[in-house]
Swiss-Prot record:
Keywords: Cell cycle, Cell division, Chromosome partition, Cytoplasm, DNA integration, DNA recombination, DNA-binding. Forms a cyclic heterotetrameric complex composed of two molecules of XerC and two molecules of XerD. Its main location: cytoplasm. The gene is xerC. Belongs to the 'phage' integrase family. XerC subfamily. GO terms for cellular component: cytoplasm. Site-specific tyrosine recombinase, which acts by catalyzing the cutting and rejoining of the recombining DNA molecules. The XerC-XerD complex is essential to convert dimers of the bacterial chromosome into monomers to permit their segregation at cell division. It also contributes to the segregational stability of plasmids. PANTHER family: PHAGE INTEGRASE-RELATED, TYROSINE RECOMBINASE XERC. Residues 13-100 form the Core-binding (CB) domain. It comes from Ralstonia pickettii (strain 12J). This is Tyrosine recombinase XerC. The active site is at R162, K197, H271, R274, H297, Y306 (o-(3'-phospho-dna)-tyrosine intermediate). Residues 122-319 form the Tyr recombinase domain. GO terms for biological process: cell division; chromosome segregation; DNA transposition.
Amino acid sequence: MPQSASVDDHGAQAPHPQIAAYLDALKFERQLSPHTLQSYTRELAVLQRLGAQHAANIDLTQLQSHHIRRMMAQLHGDGLSGRSIARALSAWRGWFKWMALRDAAVTANPVDGVRAPKSPKRLPKALSVEQAVALMEQLPGDDAETIRDRAVNELFYSCGLRLSELVSLDMRHVKAGAYESASWLDLEAREVQVLGKGSKRRTVPVGTKATEALAAWLAVRAQLAKSDAAPEDAHALFLSPRGKRLAQRQIQLRMKRNAIAAGVPADVHPHVLRHSFATHMLQSSGDLRAVQELLGHASIASTQVYTSLDFQHLAKIYDQAHPRAKKK
């Protein structure tokens, strides 16, 4: 017999008794945050609503995989993204797993083996070459912070570093007492040694413009340095006005502001410069494997997304140049 579900004063269906019990367990036993708990509540309400539509004659705990697949198909048909459906399936799977430990009648998890449809990969945003040059060259001011910001921008664009990798850089390799640099700049060799994701180390060359910008920054770095700084800050390549290692959030905020000052009409953040580096390198060289190594991707599949961007560039050139492709 299916358990009846009442309707609350606002016309919404009250939670299935076992869903209500599960939500209480998440709240009081697992102590999930209110935001996460709200997400579970929403996804399980969808399960209950769709269960009533697709299997009204059985209790929610007795749903089978074919019910779940039909419900997923409805969500997909309603326009939900693969990511949103995957989030719903995850919440449903958790509830059925919890139920299986408490109810002998629940002998299998109907969500196991059900996979959400894949969402199309979102292509990363990249600046045009002209926009990248403007961001590098049209930043007004000659104070220490502005000189530092120019060096930050140039290094991002020259090396394609992740934000976490850039802030971890020291001025040089240091091993003093308990402190040892994880990542560092070797200005003389014109390269950076980076400890990236998965503790994978790589060497990335630094271009001429970035080398010049870094030299200019190192010449004024002492203006922001503090004599009593801890080793973590004393050896940092980039400093805040308080003499601390420059924080990721500070870089993000200043880059956004500096982009506006440089007249770059784009939502610029550090990862946009990493994407721009990869896209422009691939357009110039066509060497996907080299770009993979420079970016520090463990798999070539992560780098292949840039081939789509490169094809867009080639298609645009084709449309502009081919006599039979030009729009009249």
